[in-house]
UniProtKB/Swiss-Prot annotation:
Protein source organism: Vibrio campbellii (strain ATCC BAA-1116)
Protein name per its UniProtKB record: Universal stress protein B homolog
InterPro entries, A to Z: Universal_stress_protein_B
Family, as annotated: Belongs to the universal stress protein B family.
Subcellular localization(s) per the UniProt record: Cell inner membrane
Pfam families (UniProt xref): UspB
Signal peptide: none
Keywords on record: Cell inner membrane, Cell membrane, Membrane, Transmembrane, Transmembrane helix
Keyword Membrane among UniProt keywords: yes
Membrane-spanning segments: 6-26, 86-106
UniProt keyword Membrane present: yes
Topology versus the membrane: Multi-pass membrane protein
Main localization, broad class: membrane
Amino acid sequence: MISGDTILFALMVVTGVNMVRYLTALRSLIHIMREAHPLLYQQVDGNGFFTTHGNVTKQVRLYHYIKSKEYHHHHDEIFTGKCERVRGLFILSTALLGVTLLAAFIL
């Protein structure tokens, strides 16, 4: 029989891998955003997004942009595809984090 520690460790590994996938897709989106949507790139502080002095309110602006699916009106298919990927990976990572935390308290 599989122990609770093994299940929790496996959940933590899967969650970690998916969070890395999410951050990589987000970095790729910001790189593409520089050419595809320069105004949004400036609004979300594209150069300083992943720095320690990054402006949180500008980062929240990107979150709301993706959450409300404003990218559907954009003309660039690559940009909209990246936004969809980031949105999906964010939802997946958040759900996995919730399940992992729940499992940590139960097990």
